[in-house]
Amino acid sequence: GVTVQVWEKEDRRELRFGNHIMQSVFSKIRPDHLVLPYSRFMMLGLLFCPEPKSVLHLGLGGGSIVRWMHREFPELQQTIIEINSGVIEAAHRFFDLPRDKRLRVLCADATELVPTLAEKFDLIILDAFGDYGAPEELTRIDFLHKLRACLHYDSWLVGNLWTVTGDFEEMREQWKSTFSQVLEARANQKGNMILYGSQLSKIPEKKEFEATAKNLQRHHQLDFRKMLRELNKVF
């Protein structure tokens, strides 16, 4: 399995895997802050679902997104599937992931567990990374179809993809053949591209999301309006 490392720094704690790529960052000064830009862009999915009641996460990392959503949405039920028990242990022990009845953390292989899930979710957050990018079996079209089956008609899948591995274009094509609507936002210059997919037959123009972005920004203290400018439809 992947070696889990926790790096202790003066003002922050980092979760890294064997190759030293930073997976998650926890600010000791602002423990609930989403430090890494990509994690904030994952939350841009709230534009399409401003008050989620149920979220499925594939991949836990340090749990910063899970923790943030847990605090911001007091009614939210979250299910997390993480294959590495060491990651789950580290998230609870070093990254303040609470043990709470609203958080169901399952140590399992998502490819095996997802098809057995009976419920549907408002949002699915696909953020599973190994040593070198997303595990291939989680980016294949048959798995995307299984995720689509766990969504309501108007729900969204939000995925963190790596543009530097050479197969990004192919992965984006698979999203396009799985979902009627696909949008993308470049989260940073390092190569994180966030994709948003839904079965909706049509979605509003970008400018029509302005009011939602403004409202989300007021309630959740993330710069949704700035992030909205990076959002583009994939044709």
Which positions does each model-derived feature cover?
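Conserved short-loop catalytic and cofactor-binding motifs
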Residues: 30, 131-135, 159, 163
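S-adenosyl-L-methionine
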Residues: 17
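A generic structural signal for alpha->beta connector loops
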Residues: 75-77, 100-102, 154, 179-181, ...
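C-terminal substrate-binding/active-site "lid" region of AdoMet-derived donor-dependent transferases
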Residues: 141-204
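A short, flexible beta-alpha/helix-coil linker loop
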Residues: 20-24, 129-132, 157
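The AdoMet/dcAdoMet-binding core of the Class I SAM-like
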Residues: 8, 33-153
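SAM/dcSAM-binding transferase cores
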Residues: 1-10, 14, 22-29, 46, ...
